[in-house]
Amino acid sequence: MCDDGSADNTYEVALEYKNKYPDKIVLLKNEKNMGLNYTLNRCLEAAKGEFIARMDGDDISLPTRFEKEIDFLINNSQFAVVSAPMIMFDENGEWGRTSVIERPQINDFCTHSPFFAHAVCMMKKSVFDEVGGYTVDPKFLRVEDCNLWFKVYAHGYKGANLTEPLYMMRDDRNATHRRSIKARINGCYVVYDGFKMLHMPWYKYFYVVKNTVIELAKCLIPVSLYEYIHKRKFRGGHN
């Protein structure tokens, strides 16, 4: 657990749990806010296990998540990362779920996003170390997961998705407002950069243009309309 320069009593609360479970929790603290990418890398450096799992605040890992992800990685050594569908919920309860491609190939990077749900993923620590962890660069803020998947595949590794939802992600009105214009521009850049890493043929870059137009268009439509489209997309379990 790492406190990234919080201004409230977050660290004190975390310290209580650290003192209660000293053999289970490693507590870190940044002197100032360093951002998610840097903080994730700091946690990776402190981690000693064979596998790395993560989750986001306010979300819920279902009881069998770790068991099923560890079992998959142990019994399918050809895969470096595993993820799963997520159930979406807000203050009114469950309202949708994400869809997945079970065995994403490089060409799927052109048609399906996200390739793996970051919050519910589990990955081999050795692969994290080999690809250099998360890229600490302003161009990859809020899109660190997408950049990570490109790096994993560029190093010759593969990932897989289980078909059973193992995670519940809070996705409410506040979540809709979080994605800024800067984050959307970063989202366009990370795809372009990833295609270069994977040495995609020139005609695949038409997807980069298409993705850029779509992402920037989302900045122009009213929030209420975007919320409607967003929820309609996930209610059917389609990305």
Residue locations for each model-derived region?
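A conserved acidic beta->alpha catalytic loop
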Residues: D3-E12, K32, D56
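Acidic helix N-cap motif at the loop->helix transition within catalytic regions
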Residues: D8-Y17, I60, T64
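Glycine-rich, basic loop-to-helix element that forms the pyrophosphate-binding segment
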Residues: N30-A47, K68
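Conserved nucleotide-sugar donor-binding catalytic segment
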Residues: E45, P104-K182, G187-V190
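Short aromatic/hydrophobic "clamp" motif used to bind/position activated sugar donors
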Residues: I52
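The conserved acidic donor/metal-binding loop of glycosyltransferases
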Residues: D56-I60, P85
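Conserved donor NDP-sugar-binding/catalytic core segment of glycosyltransferases
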Residues: T64-G96
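Non-catalytic, C-terminal membrane-associated alpha-helical segments of glycosyltransferases
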Residues: A175-N239
